[in-house]
Amino acid sequence: LRKKVYSFILNKPSLILEPSIGRGDLINYVSEKDDTIKFDMYEIDDTINILNKYISRDKVIFGDFLEQPIKTKYKTIIGNPPYKRMKTKTGNLYIDFVSRCYDLLEVGGELVFIIPKIFFKKKSAEDLLNNMKNNGTFTHTYHPDNKHLFEGASVDVIVFRYCKDGNING
């Protein structure tokens, strides 16, 4: 999936937002391919063992990404957000992450995420998806059709690339 995420990064960014770095797998892969790219990195779990020679712990902002006062708009955002169901406005953290990242995306920017495939059918994602479709395009999707890609989890995922074009229907 890391290879697919990297192949979907088409904006030639100098800076990428990664809102939930986990062990740093995506950043490691992207950095191995292009070590000139810088990252703004967030992670809620400050006890996580970051397995990445490209990430210095002091460069990671530890805390709840969804609560961070971020003013920067990004050309490229990548991620594999948590899939937990929690008491949030949508009931699913990954939907909240997509929504927040959509808001932080500049016009012409790309959002490349690994999320549960069910996202595109969730009632709680309907308004977000309509807003995204009215202001951009899902340009690429990849469905690996393998529910056992993640250690200790069984989830059917999809990788998508979304490009924010501004209001294409107005």
Give the role of each language-model region:
Residues L1-F8, S14-L15, S20-L51, R57, ...:
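Signature of N6-adenine DNA methyltransferases within the class I
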